[in-house]
Amino acid sequence: MGTLGFLASADVSEVRETIERVLDGDYKLEKRLMLEAEIVSETDSPKKYNAVNDVCITRGVFTKITGYSIYVNDEYLATFRADGVIISTPTGSTAYNLSAGGPVLKPDIGCMAITPICAHSLHSRSIV
């Protein structure tokens, strides 16, 4: 779990008071963009996962960098070679995405960042 606490408006020293406020209905809900990832395998049935921060596709145990072609809604955007790629929501843009050199996105913006991990090129940058 992250340690910056952007989603937590209470300090750990205020846990008791915070729980009481939540039980009293004194809280605010914020809608956040989420991602759904589906892993398709030749041997297993597809598995779906939901993510609040990001989805990462990496080279795994292989020692060589991997080629990635990025499409959004069947429209080609880019091809690059890298150790992996991070698809990040605005909520997750301050986590792994930021560490990989990606942009910080406003929480209420309806987009995501696609950021290469250690791209083997000087001009492979994030796509928003």
Question: What label would you give each PLM region?
Answer:
Residues 1-3, 119:
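Short, acidic/turn-prone active-site loops that include or flank metal/cofactor-
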Residues 3-83:
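Catalytic core of DAGKc-family lipid kinases
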Residues 128:
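C-terminal active-site/capping subdomain that shapes the small-molecule cofactor and substrate pocket
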Residues 79-82, 87-123:
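Gly/Ser/Thr-rich active-site loops/lids in small-molecule metabolic enzymes
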